[in-house]
From Swiss-Prot:
Role summary: Involved in transcription antitermination. Required for transcription of ribosomal RNA (rRNA) genes. Binds specifically to the boxA antiterminator sequence of the ribosomal RNA (rrn) operons.
Gene Ontology biological process: DNA-templated transcription termination; transcription antitermination
Cross-referenced HAMAP family: NusB
Domain of life: Bacteria
Record's keyword annotation contains RNA-binding: yes
Organism: Sodalis glossinidius (strain morsitans)
UniProt cross-references to SUPFAM superfamilies, sorted A to Z: NusB-like
One GO cellular component term noted in the UniProt record for this chain: cytosol
NCBIfam families recorded: nusB
Protein name: Transcription antitermination protein NusB
Coiled coil: none
Pfam families xrefs: NusB
């Protein structure tokens, strides 16, 4: 699958995860609705499903990974930043096929696309601290 299709999958996963975080609706229902409403012709749909469902299902575990490295309480994080961090931490912890630097760079790009003006710097700072704990060999 092309890297652009994976990038689009990450973008869609952040949007679906954001929706789930706000609505607390069923994970599968949001996925079905999201895929029905979006043009997914340029999306790696299987990767989207893995990222979204994996990040949502493992949200508490992912939150525990990031919490010690946040400059504020987890509850004070914006929904976009939380979604981006959850996707990145899911990739770092569960998708060993994704290179370390790719996961971090993609998260920064997602924050630039969807987050507040300076959120990409915050995301980078958190991931720079937590990623070596997840992947000590930086691979």
């Amino acid at each position: 699958m092309k890297p652009a299709a994976r990038r689009r999958a990450r973008e869609c996963a952040v949007q679906a995860l954001y929706s789930w975080q706000l609505s607390h609706n069923d994970i599968a229902d949001i996925e079905v609705q999201f895929l029905a409403e979006q043009d997914t012709s340029d999306v790696d749909v299987a990767y989207f499903r893995d990222l979204y469902a994996g990040a949502a299902t493992n949200a508490q575990e992912l939150d525990k990974l990031m919490a010690p490295y946040l400059s504020r309480q987890l509850e004070e994080l914006g929904h976009v930043e939380r979604a981006v961090l959850r996707i990145a931490l899911f990739e770092l912890s569960k998708r060993q096929d994704v290179p370390y630097k790719v996961a971090i760079n993609e998260a920064i790009e997602l924050a630039k696309t969807f987050g507040a003006e300076e959120s990409h710097k915050f995301i980078n700072g958190v991931l720079d601290k937590v990623a070596p704990q997840i992947r000590p060999n930086r691979k």
